[in-house]
Amino acid sequence: MKVLVDMNLSPAWAHFRRERGFESIHLSAVGSGRADAELMHWAAERDYILLTADLDFGATLAATRGRRPSVVQVRSDLLAPAAIGDVVVAALRQSQEELVDGALISVDANRARLRILPLKS
């Protein structure tokens, strides 16, 4: 499973993921000036899951009824891997099949909520 870490999360997230067995890169390594639609297209073409704290990606998936890329939204006041990283990793591992097929996961400190793509109104 390949994870692309959005600019609104620290590059430490990519390192944190790699330490736990995920192929992971930070957006700064592939070009940070991309618009959201271009970023989603880039991730989908390369089979990356997008890890972000930006809720706009979920809204874009809903508006376009898109199936790819899968998006994992981190919803927490504390965005450091040390604060919520293990919860995010657990959600990724638990939902691996769904993420391959297309899913939106919202993760907070207490739970992860999974929605299968495309999102229904």
Feature map (PLM): residue ranges:
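Charged phosphate-binding loop/patch that engages nucleotide di/tri-phosphates or the phosphate backbone
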Residues: 95-121
